[in-house]
Amino acid sequence: VFARLIREGDLGFCDAYLDGWWSTPDLQAFLDLIHADNDEMYDSFPGMGMVRAWEKFRFWLQSNSKSQAKKNISYHYDLGNDFYKLWLDDTMTYSSAIFESGQESTEKAQLAKYGSLIDQMGAKKGEHILEIGCGWGGFAARLAERTGARLTATTISEEQYKYARERIETLGVADRISIVKQDYRNLTGQFDRVVSIEMIEAVGHEYLPTYFSKIADLLTTEGAAMIQAITMPDHRYSQYLREVDYIRTRVFPGSNVPSISAMVEAVAKKSDLRPTNIFDFGYHCARTLREWRIRFLENEDKIAKLGYDEHFRRAWIYYLC
């Protein structure tokens, strides 16, 4: 293990876990101990230059052009809906919930999150809303239940597209909820509101200005956008961009967790959008991951029976820590 750590850096350490070279009764507690009160530990341990250079080159090849973005999304999201059903809650929501009391189930917390977004955007009957990155249709379904607004929701995942369409048809609201399979950069039209829930992590740093510019173009004059994002602390972002890490190379190719400053700069660079309210949900994100990890571990045997081998399962357990 230590030889791989020296040769391959932090990625070698992660890969050694995936390969079964080391284990621990409580992976989360072990990783928390490594990182406790030591922010520098979050910066990658590079290992040997040639190995790291190869990883960086591979990541560069996965930059989110329109054609590559579809491949990156498919790698992560098209693993099979039955796989995700085993550890997500019944809303099939793959983004942070909001635990208002701390005692509610993940499903109730996800519905509370959707309700909060709908209330904040003030969606009304007759308005047309756009969702960029609709996942399995959780927000679309909740919006249909709560309002009379129209919604166009987009994804480029084949599995999500099929599931979300069937979901909307089953609910009988296909007359006002439309699921489309289209890259956000190809969208046209005018919308009263735009919502994007933890999709920005799939955009890529170099495409952030394009993302916000497209949102601005799609909004009406009095329109507003709501973006839910996992963020990187500003003081770590430059180092993060220079390196590669476990998630971006092993789990979600092409992904990038932006900092708040990076998003604000991207907004100013190519759009006339104006940031207003910011809500920090860091605790809720950590809690959501914990609930997912618990369900994943509880259902690991069922996941294995679907054909996902031990290497794959260990990769996802590590990812959910």
Regions found by a protein language model. Give the residues of each.
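Feature captures hydrophobic
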Residues: V1-Q110, S116, A123
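Conserved class I S-adenosyl-L-methionine
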Residues: K125-G133
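Conserved SAM-binding loop of SAM-dependent methyltransferases across substrates and taxa
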Residues: W136-T147
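Conserved SAM-binding loop
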Residues: A164-R165
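A short acidic, Gly/Pro-enriched loop at the edge of an enzyme's catalytic core
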Residues: R185-V194
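A short glycine-rich, Lys/Arg-flanked "PGG" loop and its adjoining helix->strand segment in the class I
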Residues: P209-E222
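Substrate-binding/catalytic lobe of Class I Rossmann-like enzymes that use SAM or dcSAM, i.e.
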Residues: T231-C321
